[in-house]
Each structure stands twice: as C-alpha cells, then as structure tokens.
C-alpha cells in the first residue's frame, strides 16, 4: 500500500531548486483543478482563477508564482469546506462537472 500523504514540498530539504518548486506548484494546481471540477461549479473555479490574476498579479503587482500560490490556497479552502459540509460525490453524488450535468470542464486558462 502506498503512503497517501504528500511528499515534503520542494524548498524544505535544501536540495531542491527554485525551478523544481515552481514545477511542484504547477503540478499541485493542476491536480487540485482536476479534483475540483468534480465537486465545484466550473464558473466558480474560473472566476477564482480570473480574480486571483486580476487582483494579485495585475493590481498588486505580484509575481505569477505568488498569484498561483494564492489561487491554490483559495481553492484548497473551497474544496476542504465542500468535503467538510458532507460531500456525497464519493458515493456517486454529483457527477463530473460539479453540480451541473455534462462532461467535466477544462481547467482554467494557463493550467493546461
């Protein structure tokens, strides 16, 4: 049986490079988006992505990696609260695409 816990993120052991940390961030966001589209409305995911970029990157002048990190934090909280409130998705509740029927939507722009 494999260990379900996540590995120590890059940057904590002193052996990783900044590039590996950015790759880890991108992989983590993509994995979270793949899971989130099965539980949350695609409009919510898209708007959180757009507003994160508009506020953190455009208005505040933060770097793209910081903007992605803030998006990751917001989406993790949204998915956590969804599960905490009693998600029935694991038992076949809402299908792919969140609360709407149809195929799962594509991930937000820039995360393909």
UniProtKB/Swiss-Prot annotation:
A motif (Nuclear localization signal) lies at residues 65-72. Coiled coil: none annotated. Keywords: AIDS, Host nucleus, Host-virus interaction, Inhibition of host innate immune response by virus, Viral immunoevasion, Virion. Its main location: virion. One of its GO terms (biological process) is symbiont-mediated suppression of host innate immune response. Gene3D superfamilies: 1.20.5.4730. Signal peptide: none annotated. The keyword Aminoacyl-tRNA synthetase does not apply. It is found in: Virion; Host nucleus. Residues 61-80 are annotated as: Binds to human NUP153. One of its GO terms (molecular function) is identical protein binding. GO terms for cellular component: host cell nucleus; virion component. The keyword Nucleotidyltransferase does not apply. InterPro entries: Lentiviral_Vpx_assoc_factor, RetroV_VpR/X. Interacts with the P6 region of unprocessed GAG. Interacts with host VPRBP/DCAF1, leading to change substrate specificity of the CUL4A-DDB1 E3 ligase complex. Interacts with host NUP153. Belongs to the lentivirus VPX protein family. Plays a role in nuclear translocation of the viral pre-integration complex (PIC), thus is required for the virus to infect non-dividing cells. Targets specific host proteins for degradation by the 26S proteasome. Acts by associating with the cellular CUL4A-DDB1 E3 ligase complex through direct interaction with host VPRPB/DCAF-1. This change in the E3 ligase substrate specificity results in the degradation of host SAMHD1. In turn, SAMHD1 depletion allows viral replication in host myeloid cells by preventing SAMHD1-mediated hydrolysis of intracellular dNTPs necessary for reverse transcription. This is Protein Vpx.
């Amino acid at each position: 049986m494999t260990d379900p816990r996540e590995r120590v993120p890059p940057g904590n052991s002193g052996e990783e490079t900044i590039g590996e940390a950015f790759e880890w961030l991108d992989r983590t966001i993509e994995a979270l988006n793949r899971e989130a589209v099965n539980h949350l409305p695609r409009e919510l995911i898209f708007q959180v992505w757009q507003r994160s970029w508009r506020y953190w990157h455009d208005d505040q002048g933060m770097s793209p990696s910081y903007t992605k990190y803030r998006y990751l934090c917001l989406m993790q909280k949204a998915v956590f609260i969804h599960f905490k409130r009693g998600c029935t998705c694991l038992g076949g509740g809402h299908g792919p695409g969140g609360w709407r029927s149809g195929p799962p939507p594509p991930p937000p722009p820039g995360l393909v």
